């Protein structure tokens, strides 16, 4: 039933043109490439398949080398944030831009609160009554510290349960984005990028642990570091800043990414192939030993940045080959990425519940879970994609943007 409904919605979807789109409402001319929306949709599909505990999970976990859906999702989210809100800063000023970003962060925070209460009020009860170890493990601090403290810490974004820990990361980056854009406008991006790189470098040498120790000693922080999320915020902020920088340059039509890709695609291919070989050799037993930190996902090790840049260069260089992959379901998912991203966690909880005492789901239930998950996510995307496209982008604007198909790109004009 879910599959039939979602396929019907897909066929009936008329507000997503087959080419790129032209949207009015922001002023000036901006091109939006539908393949980038599709890329965000693909990151969500990839992330969902990685999180659902099925037999294909090991096969979709970093299959292209030392790169995961998280890098792509964070970078693309930052790319759109930089592009859209840099234009708002130029057109409407710092106040309007900050307010719009605050509202978007508030929307994400509301979704996060809903997911937290689903976890604490529904999942926690099922974990105890059903003796489900998978669900119990993701909420172990909730059970150890007690509901009152766990809920308070989670609402303050201090306690970040597994699975849900990327949302506080995203929220913090959104809240810091206005300051980043304003500072970049005043002092230039080179200083912002330099400072961000320095913080990332510090994160590779224990900055997170050092700051945690200081906070525990002087601020009374009494939550284990591992309960504050797997992602090292001090490292991952560099990926966000890089994405915002590219987005701001894109907004100014000053992002010669095709030219860059043409120059570097051969060494990029060699790097990507080498790291892919290392990745699969490691899976077969290669011990990286003291080098593992250079490949670490949670601390965004240097080889992950190199791998990401190499694959990005190849995708840009051969975009004509991958552009046909920008099919309407992926575009739709990408255009409602915020809501789809949050909704997929519900099905991850369901998957963990179906696991019981095993390490993953077997047999027909895994197929049913995957089909129902993506059918439901398409319904979510259908509901919210039009709202995301048509949301007024300017201060004081009550007019809904119009959408027109063009041969290439999209423009927003008042």
Predicted regions and their residues:
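Alpha-helical transmembrane segments and their immediate juxtamembrane cytosolic regions
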Residues: 3-12, 17-414
